[in-house]
């Protein structure tokens, strides 16, 4: 299957500048193509991942991906999709963000072989361009009326846009032109909001490299959920690729909770499963939705891809422990992941009566209630039911000498650490 046909089947193409021309190029030769990201933060979220998944699909089809981290454009900020001016970051913060993104993106691509990926930073070819060179060599190639008509600018005219953000599309166009000239890059990929920036780059290439220069642009549809809300957010906020911001367990849980109405679409967008495999999972969604086979596959594929096989096994282990209530097999690291959002208390390093301990921490409102819950078998320590009001909590009740997990009833968990 031609890579363009595959992307169309997956519903991953929104606009193309020259579908027939691009289809011919990718059929006849290996091409270089790029997608960029600005270091506006120290981590990508799963929304950022979408265009890079397309880039990876091209690599799997034998083409050479170029990953651009915008050390230069990041100093300005892309106005696309923004209702107000971005706050500028310090160069030091941008440099730190660049390195963080390099690490995350480095896990997604293969940097060896005939279709080896490369990673570039547009600061390297932009830093020495003087303001006079910028205006003379590039500014003169852009018609202000054309720039004003692009959605990325037009949408901001009423509230105002600075010259800095107005000029962003010129800098991005310079990137495409540079990669065309020095890396033989023929295609830029981006989200649907990048169409104006991409076409600006194509215009600059034709002016700088000649009217017969062959270059293409392709954008990806905005991904929304069946309920109309924005993809990539949970109740706790964005789902990050950085495991310190979103743990692998939380990452796994995000995908496992996908709505039946969305899961097949996500399998097409985010996994490398074949059409036959996805059709089989789609059938299971229709016939056996309660088994959630599609969601489990999606969660497993994504956790392995972004994190690792080991991280997936850890997420599955945590999920199983929480479902069964048997938490004794969990490590301290797994407990920190799985119980990140439960009420957490800090206890003294001392031997204390269970009833007194529950009340002193605030898990129980009174000794009377604590005794009643213990007597009735509603209190569990590390998964074991406690019905003895005389029990003493000591070091033997700690997992790896760091945590004690308390459960009240069937699902109410509390995490206790120690001073």
From Swiss-Prot:
Transmembrane helix recorded as keyword: no
Reaction(s) catalysed (UniProt annotation): tRNA(Tyr) + L-tyrosine + ATP = L-tyrosyl-tRNA(Tyr) + AMP + diphosphate + H(+)
Keywords of this entry: Aminoacyl-tRNA synthetase, ATP-binding, Cytoplasm, Ligase, Nucleotide-binding, Protein biosynthesis, RNA-binding
Compartments it resides in: Cytoplasm
Binding-site positions, L-tyrosine: 34, 168, 172
InterPro entries: aa-tRNA-synth_I_CS (IPR001412), aa-tRNA-synth_Ic (IPR002305), Rossmann-like_a/b/a_fold (IPR014729), S4_RNA-bd (IPR002942), S4_RNA-bd_sf (IPR036986), SYY-like_C (IPR054608), Tyr-tRNA-ligase (IPR002307), Tyr-tRNA-ligase_bac-type (IPR024088)
Keyword Aminoacyl-tRNA synthetase recorded: yes
SUPFAM superfamilies: Alpha-L RNA-binding motif, Nucleotidylyl transferase
GO cellular component: cytosol
A family per Pfam: tRNA-synt_1b
Name this polypeptide is given: Tyrosine--tRNA ligase
Native organism: Listeria welshimeri serovar 6b (strain ATCC 35897 / DSM 20650 / CCUG 15529 / CIP 8149 / NCTC 11857 / SLCC 5334 / V8)
High-level lineage: Bacteria, Bacillati, Bacillota, Bacilli, Bacillales
């Amino acid at each position: 299957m031609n890579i363009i046909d595959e992307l169309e089947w997956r519903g991953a193409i929104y606009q193309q500048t020259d579908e027939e021309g691009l289809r011919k190029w990718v059929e006849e030769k290996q091409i270089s193509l790029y997608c960029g990201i600005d270091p506006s933060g120290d981590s990508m979220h799963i929304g950022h991942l979408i265009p890079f998944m397309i880039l990876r699909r091209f690599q799997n089809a034998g083409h050479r991906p170029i990953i651009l981290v915008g050390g230069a454009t990041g100093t300005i900020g892309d106005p696309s999709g923004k209702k107000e001016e971005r706050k500028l970051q310090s160069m030091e913060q941008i440099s730190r963000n660049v390195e963080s993104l390099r690490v995350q993106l480095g896990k997604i691509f293969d940097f060896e072989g005939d279709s080896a990926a490369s990673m570039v930073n547009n600061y390297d070819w932009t830093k020495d361009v003087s303001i006079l060179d910028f205006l003379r060599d590039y500014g003169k190639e852009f018609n202000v009326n054309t720039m004003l008509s692009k959605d990325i600018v037009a949408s901001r005219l009423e509230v105002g846009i600075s010259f800095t953000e107005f000029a962003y599309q010129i800098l991005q166009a310079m990137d495409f032109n540079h990669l065309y000239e020095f890396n033989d890059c023929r295609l830029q990929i981006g989200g649907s909001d990048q169409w104006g920036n991409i076409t600006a780059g194509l215009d600059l290439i034709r002016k700088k490299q000649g009217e017969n220069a062959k270059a293409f642009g392709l954008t990806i549809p905005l991904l929304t959920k069946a309920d109309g809300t924005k993809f990539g957010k949970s109740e706790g906020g964005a789902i990050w690729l950085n495991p310190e911001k979103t743990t692998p367990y939380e990452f796994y849980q995000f995908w496992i909770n996908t709505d039946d109405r969305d899961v097949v679409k996500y399998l097409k967008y985010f996994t490398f499963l074949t059409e036959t495999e996805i059709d089989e999972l789609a059938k299971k969604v229709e016939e056996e939705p309660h088994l959630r086979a599609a969601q489990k596959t999606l969660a497993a594929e994504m956790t392995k891809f972004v994190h690792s096989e080991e991280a997936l096994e850890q997420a599955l282990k945590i999920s199983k422990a929480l479902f069964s209530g048997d938490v004794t097999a969990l490590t301290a690291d797994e407990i920190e992941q799985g119980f990140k959002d439960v009420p957490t208390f800090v206890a003294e390093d001392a031997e204390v009566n269970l009833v007194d301990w529950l009340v002193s921490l605030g898990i129980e409102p009174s000794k009377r209630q604590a005794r009643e819950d213990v007597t009735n078998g509603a209190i569990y320590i590390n998964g074991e039911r406690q019905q003895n009001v005389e029990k003493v909590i000591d070091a033997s009740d700690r997992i790896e000498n760091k945590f004690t997990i308390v459960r009240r009833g069937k699902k109410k968990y509390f995490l206790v650490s120690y001073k």
